[in-house]
Amino acid sequence: MTPATPLNLLISNDDGISALGIRTLANTLAEAGHQVTVVCPDRERSATGHGLTLHRPIRTEIVEGIFDPRVTAWSCSGTPSDCVKFALSAVLKERPDFVLSGINHGSNLGTDVLYSGTVSAAMEGLLEGIHSIALSLADYTSHNFQPAADFAVKLLCQLMEKRPHWAIANQDAPVLLNINVPNLEKEKLAGVKITRQGLRRYIEQFQKRQDPRGKTYYWLSGEVIEELPQPDEPNIPLDFPTDVQAIAAGYITITPLQYIMNDLHRIQTLAQEDWQI
């Protein structure tokens, strides 16, 4: 799908500069006619959340030979959030139209987003007032990122076409869309579903191990709890499924997120009490 107007796109991730997911996404968007700049960690940075690098230097370098020649790429020794901050402050001469993060190797559903470097890179774009998209392939075993990249191209076209309808109060307030794509052939996809954030938990275990020198270390492992009741959201109709539910039904999920985490119900309840110094 050729865009009516080529967009200026910044792409980052948390899987690192050599990851197939970001290479597939960046090259596909460049082939579609967009101006693409990649700034991402120089190594694996999964589950770093919204961490920043403080009190030590951040090193960067231009990367050649990995991406399509039309893509400008940088690697950064910092976190995904560092990468987006660096790109916006020191690399890009013009403000990007969108910040994209991914394609992550594995899902970012429900409460995963609190730990996700992928979502945090997109959240950094949102904090800077830029429309942002986090993309994840919801399968740790598959390396077929192309369907998710193709969907990103189509989604950007649709977002630009529908902009007057999804801009909040016609003020074009920035939006963050967290997108998860099932590992299914296109004809087997159930469709695209707007979802609310769900709940995801793991059976976690710290495995005690020993290194070759006999020193003890621990390795965190875990399995997803599949049958977990999903929470109700008083401000969202119940006919909106959670991202966890919709991905299980074979849908591409689009979950709008924000960085304001107020608990409105508790604010109202606690404000009715008399609190003493």
Curated annotation (Swiss-Prot):
Give the catalysed reaction(s), semicolon-separated.
Answer: a ribonucleoside 5'-phosphate + H2O = a ribonucleoside + phosphate
Gene Ontology cellular component? cytoplasm
**Record's protein name:** 5'-nucleotidase SurE
Taxonomy of origin reads: Bacteria, Bacillati, Cyanobacteriota, Cyanophyceae, Oscillatoriophycideae
- Which gene codes for it? surE
Q: How many cofactors are bound and how?
A: Binds 1 divalent metal cation per subunit.
One MF term in GO for this entry?
A: nucleotide binding
Q: What does this protein do?
A: Nucleotidase that shows phosphatase activity on nucleoside 5'-monophosphates.
**One Pfam family in the UniProt entry:** SurE
Q: Does the keyword Glycoprotein apply?
A: no
Q: Which cofactor does it need?
A: a divalent metal cation
Q: Which InterPro entries match?
A: SurE (IPR030048), SurE-like_Pase/nucleotidase (IPR002828), SurE-like_sf (IPR036523)
The EC number of this protein is: 3.1.3.5
Give the enzyme's main class according to its UniProt record, as a single word: hydrolase
